[in-house]
Amino acid sequence: MAKAKFERTKPHVNIGTIGHVDHGKTTLTAAISRVLSERLPSNTNVKQDFDAIDSAPEERQRGITINISHIEYETEKRHYAHVDAPGHADYIKNMITGAAQMDGAILVVAATDGAMAQTREHVLLAKQVGVPYLLVALNKADMVSDEEILELVELEVRELLSTHGFDGENVPVVRVSGLKALEGDQKWGDAVMELMKAVDESIPDPVRDRDKPFLMPIEDVFTITGRGTVVTGRAERGVLAVNSEVEIVGIRPTQKTTVTGIEMFRKQLDEAWAGENCGLLLRGTKREDVERGQVVVKPGSVTPHTKFEGKAYILSKDEGGRHNPFYSNYRPQFYFRTTDVTGVITLPEGTEMVMPGDTISITVDLIQPIAMEEGLGFAIREGGRTVGAGTVVKILE
């Protein structure tokens, strides 16, 4: 069967549902899918039922297995990819490894319970790993008849968001009932449409990868006799034109060069675009001047660093991780983009050790500099096997 062509007529936005266990994230996701499929029928808006979303397929991201569901739908304004993870651990792993980069998220809070422990944990994580916008779905609102209670829960959630650096005062809070909307109730179907209108309006259009400064991690280096050195990789973002000046950053001192040719599938190109696998011919660069693990970037856009604060999830023994805890001064490899660099971990004050299965904040000192930005993901490896994964939260030096 031929794959449906992806129509680029609307802006594309990645979102997800976050929040405490059993507050109705998956039910609400299914309700959004149902209501949109009925009210805005299209090829994209195909109803996904609860079970299909709940039995999330396994994905591997930086060596960690995560159960995660992806569904797509569209409003009149936009096309959305929506991620939902069934278990709490899957959420944490998803957010820390950036398995699904979110442009914004719907925080689901049950009106019957208010904000709970995992609500707080997800909001904190969303801030740390750089989810830029949240809005609130006050779910199970059909089960609370007292207006005062609804207002109190809303106030509490707004305060929680403000505490963690979100704009709690102005965040949209929409009262919904995922279950009632899923059962076809007209009033609660309207509430889902109101929620989607709030998503359309409060989560800004993301900056497309193509509009960001060019970056390509080097995967391989070749010499082409008579022409020079070619580096290959997949352009992560930006657009690069032939004869542009670039910098090669990481591992060694930063060097400037000019890209004199761009090739993809043995064809000459004028430009390399985000998402494309290409070879870049570098002027006056020797084969031994560059190596896997460095990145080719727009000059001045990314700098090399060795010390950072990160947030990491350490695999449990059952997930193929370590069998015993580790302590400060643990020296694993940190896998950034295409290469491993040894680093020394310092644990936060008051944390003696880290057990397999823990989520932690760490300070890391790398023995070689890496082209680094906040939000960059990494795997933690020991002798080639993954024992954890994380995200750079703050660059120190």
UniProtKB/Swiss-Prot annotation:
Transmembrane segments: none annotated. Residues 19-26 are annotated as: G1. This is Elongation factor Tu. Keywords: Cytoplasm, Elongation factor, GTP-binding, Hydrolase, Magnesium, Metal-binding, Nucleotide-binding, Protein biosynthesis. GTP hydrolase that promotes the GTP-dependent binding of aminoacyl-tRNA to the A-site of ribosomes during protein biosynthesis. SUPFAM superfamilies: EF-Tu/eEF-1alpha/eIF2-gamma C-terminal domain, P-loop containing nucleoside triphosphate hydrolases, Translation proteins. Residues 177-179 are annotated as: G5. Residues 139-142 are annotated as: G4. Disulfide bonds: none annotated. It comes from the Bacteria. Mg(2+) binds at residue 26. Residues 84-87 are annotated as: G3. It is found in: Cytoplasm. Coiled coil: none annotated. NCBIfam families: EF-Tu (TIGR00485), PRK00049.1 (NF000766), PRK12735.1 (NF009372), PRK12736.1 (NF009373), small_GTP (TIGR00231). Belongs to the TRAFAC class translation factor GTPase superfamily. Classic translation factor GTPase family. EF-Tu/EF-1A subfamily. It catalyses: GTP + H2O = GDP + phosphate + H(+). Residues 63-67 are annotated as: G2. Its EC number is 3.6.5.3. InterPro entries: EF-Tu_GTP-bd, EF-Tu_GTPase, EFTu-like_2, EFTU_2, G_TR_CS, P-loop_NTPase, Small_GTP-bd, T_Tr_GTP-bd_dom.
